[in-house]
Amino acid sequence: MSAEVDTNIPKENVPEEVVEAKTTTTTTTMEPEPLIVEDLKSTTIESTPVKIGDPTSNEQIAREEPKPTITEPSTTKSVAAEPTTEQHQETAVKLESVKEADAEAAARVESTEDADGEKALSTSQPSVSFDKTTKTHDGSPLSKFFSELPEILKVAGHNEMWGIILDPSEDHVQTSIVLEKFLRANTKDVTKAKAQLTEALKWRKAMQPQKLLVDTEFDKVKFGKLGYVTSYPTSEGGKEVITWNIYGAVKDTKKTFSDVPEFLRWRAALMELSIRELDLASATEKIPENGPDPYRMIQVHDYLNVSFLRMDPGIRAASKETIQTFSMAYPELLKEKFFVNVPMVMGWVFTAMKIFLSADTIKKFHPLSYGSDLGAEIPGIAEKLPKEYGGKGEELESGFTVKYSGDDVPKSD
């Protein structure tokens, strides 16, 4: 997972004002000549408002400057008389006076432009305050989500997500990463993202997954060699983080999966270890609003020698709970997910996932019949992968894992 106020305030389309000049008639009536005054803007002139296009404004101008006499049009057809040279001169003088008044009004418009802009802003874009330390949002989904954050934190009673203390200030990079991920998981629907974030924060408050990673020692017999985290440098200067679940390492399915809450705690601790490798808490770049998300990981589930997943109800319950909880608590952290050495009887797993995950997430899933095919799917780091996954790198046991009681398996940093 910064917005600025839009100062491009729309201005009123001011129509051209037509001032008709007519001479005073004696025995004949002169046809009126249109005098065009162009591009006049609405303005406020000192204590008396004068607005072009407003009848009262024209009267104000008339009081200040001489104006041609306006006569009511006759109901009968008039015969136009050829204006005299004196009449032309009189009309020109009056037109010049009107132009001078218009120039003065235009100068006053220029001098009050900033004040008028601020007034228009206050009426067309009402500000929304988060608190004393935050900025007015710009109307984008992310900015609106920021405006909801204080209420979310109050309702949840918790302000930590993935090692990040959430901050309502829109310039807080790490918070923007979290919010953007929850938005993308909900197709930019702020209301849905707000509900999910609130639920995720409540879950973290109860589960305390970071403490599970740091303080808890898990049962080696139940979970030993079941999960690892590896990190490989890329040619672009970044790194590819992979979480591995080696289900073939399970020796006693009932011990490992029968206690679903215990399995979920172990799995959450492993997930927190993966997130730590992503360095979200120290990130300095926001996720581009409509660009690729660089803060994601790869997951690999290996089912080599697994022949017990089709019917065992305990395993199904653990899998269902994990999928449902993680889709809520860890949205948009998955770049791709590979299921390797998948037997045909594992079809029910993919069916279960479709119930809780979005179509876009399902597209990230890639079942592979053989583990050695994995390297071809991740060519950028293929050679760094363990041999059984198509590479030439170190074994998984050299990677990171959670703490286990009474053994010397690799520990998390």
UniProtKB/Swiss-Prot annotation:
GO biological process: Golgi to plasma membrane protein transport; regulation of exocytosis
Pfam families: CRAL_TRIO (PF00650), CRAL_TRIO_N (PF03765)
One term under GO cellular component: endoplasmic reticulum membrane
Lineage: Eukaryota, Fungi, Dikarya, Ascomycota, Pezizomycotina
Residue spans of biased composition, Polar residues class: 121-131
SUPFAM superfamilies: CRAL/TRIO domain, CRAL/TRIO N-terminal domain
Chain spans, region Disordered: 1-141
Membrane-protein topology: Peripheral membrane protein
Catalysed reactions, as listed in the record: a 1,2-diacyl-sn-glycero-3-phospho-(1D-myo-inositol)(in) = a 1,2-diacyl-sn-glycero-3-phospho-(1D-myo-inositol)(out)
Described purpose of this protein according to its UniProt entry: Non-classical phosphatidylinositol (PtdIns) transfer protein (PITP), which exhibits PtdIns-binding/transfer activity in the absence of detectable PtdCho-binding/transfer activity. Regulates PtdIns(4,5)P2 homeostasis at the plasma membrane. Heme-binding protein that may play a role in organic oxidant-induced stress responses.
Protein name: Phosphatidylinositol transfer protein sfh5
Residues holding heme: Y247, R267, H301, Y303, K337
Bias-annotated ranges (Basic and acidic residues): 85-111
Subcellular location: Cytoplasm; Endoplasmic reticulum membrane; Microsome membrane
Family the UniProt entry places it in: Belongs to the SFH5 family.
Highest taxon, organism lineage: Eukaryota
